[in-house]
């Protein structure tokens, strides 16, 4: 039987060394994770393990950030499944990353190697090996978590039985790399960055991280939604139309973005933000596999794809490309929402339907009835 963490509690697991795709070595890696539900293994070696992949600034506590979808009787039913979510390699919520201790006793900082999505998945595979899990019923995730899910399907089809890929593309586009590189530049131009070695200085590059979050958050939401919510309204008690520009006299949307920035700065590490954003820039399912379409066609496990109709970060046509070229497409679903990219996190009713459909399609004999499935191919 696997050695699993107590239910719902943060735990860590040593997984040994990781050799990155680019050739760097990360010794003695730790992966943090949460687990819900009891592990079951069938006579044929299949299991009830569901692996959830979090997005860029997420963490392993999926029952918190996907609270409407993970739990007893919910779409990701912890009465039926053993649900596991890890904190990604390079993160800052328990897994080894730039803010972790280096073997020499200092911080990794700028010495932490560049990683890509495949390195993240390799670390998760070593994590599963370390705790004694050899088969996974399903892996699923959105955005950066969707990129990892897609790589799981390509790298380890003998381990994963099915996958649900949400709100992501087969590779980073020039548009995405440009947006994400601007965020990295905002952090690296903060005078507290110190080339990534700020951990012992007592000063974090908070302004740079906040600026990066403002840029990113606009791509996570829908243009019409933002305009309908804020328009050209001033923030209450402030006047952005005065005779001189003053930073403390803001439009309402500026105040909203300030709030989003402040929240992230309090909970996330700038070094991890740079590391993980760079990993997203490197995302390319076709690299070394004969190109995008050939790589997608070679994926043999059943894959469900879902996207958001108003997503400006990972536009819906990118999920259509996935669906047209995957070797074993299970289904295609569209999330209809003014919210944009974040809809896979916020549109709980639609996501509930999509995920219940996913599990009913891969487990037709289980007590997990489907409502209906939509195909947009």
Swiss-Prot record:
Residues 48-347 form the AB hydrolase-1 domain. Keywords: Acyltransferase, Amino-acid biosynthesis, Cytoplasm, Methionine biosynthesis, Transferase. Its EC number is 2.3.1.31. One of its GO terms (biological process) is homoserine metabolic process. Substrate binds at residues 213, 342. One of its GO terms (cellular component) is cytoplasm. Its main location: cytoplasm. It is an enzyme of class 2 (transferase). It catalyses: L-homoserine + acetyl-CoA = O-acetyl-L-homoserine + CoA. Belongs to the AB hydrolase superfamily. MetX family. Transfers an acetyl group from acetyl-CoA to L-homoserine, forming acetyl-L-homoserine. This is Homoserine O-acetyltransferase. It comes from Corynebacterium efficiens (strain DSM 44549 / YS-314 / AJ 12310 / JCM 11189 / NBRC 100395).
């Amino acid at each position: 039987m696997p050695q699993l963490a107590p239910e719902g509690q943060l735990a860590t697991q040593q997984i040994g060394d990781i050799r990155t795709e680019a050739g760097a070595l990360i010794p003695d890696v730790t992966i943090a994770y949460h687990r819900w539900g009891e592990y079951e293994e069938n006579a044929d070696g299949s299991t009830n393990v569901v692996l959830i992949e979090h997005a860029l600034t997420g963490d392993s506590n999926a029952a918190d950030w996907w609270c409407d979808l993970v739990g007893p009787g919910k779409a990701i039913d912890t009465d039926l499944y053993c649900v596991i979510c890890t904190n990604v390699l390079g993160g800052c919520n328990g897994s080894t990353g730039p803010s972790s201790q280096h073997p020499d006793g200092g911080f990794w900082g700028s010495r932490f190697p560049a990683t890509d999505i495949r390195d993240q998945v390799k670390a998760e595979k070593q994590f599963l090996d370390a705790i004694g899990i050899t088969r996974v019923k399903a892996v699923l995730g959105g955005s950066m978590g969707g990129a990892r899910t897609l790589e799981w399907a390509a790298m380890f089809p003998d381990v994963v039985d099915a996958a649900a890929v949400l709100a992501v593309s087969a590779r980073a586009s020039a548009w995405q790399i440009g947006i994400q590189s601007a965020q990295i530049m905002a952090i690296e131009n903060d005078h507290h960055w110190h080339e990534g070695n700020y951990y012992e200085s007592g000063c974090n590059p908070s302004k740079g991280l906040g600026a990066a979050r403002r840029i990113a958050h606009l791509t996570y939401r829908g243009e019409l939604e933002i305009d309908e919510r804020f328009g050209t309204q001033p923030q209450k008690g402030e006047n952005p139309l005065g005779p001189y520009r003053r930073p403390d006299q803001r439009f309402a949307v500026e105040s909203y973005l300030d709030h989003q920035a402040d929240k992230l700065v309090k909970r996330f590490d700038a070094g991890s933000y740079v590391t993980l954003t760079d990993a997203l820039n490197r995302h390319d399912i076709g690299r070394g596999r004969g190109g995008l379409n050939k790589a997608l066609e070679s994926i043999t496990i059943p894959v469900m794809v879902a996207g958001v109709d108003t997503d400006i970060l990972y536009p819906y046509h990118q999920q259509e490309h996935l669906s047209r070229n995957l070797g074993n497409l299970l289904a295609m679903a569209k999330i209809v929402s003014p919210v944009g990219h974040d809809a896979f996190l916020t549109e709980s009713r639609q996501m509930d339907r999509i995920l219940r459909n996913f599990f009913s399609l891969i487990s037709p004999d289980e007590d997990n009835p489907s409502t209906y499935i939509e195909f947009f191919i």
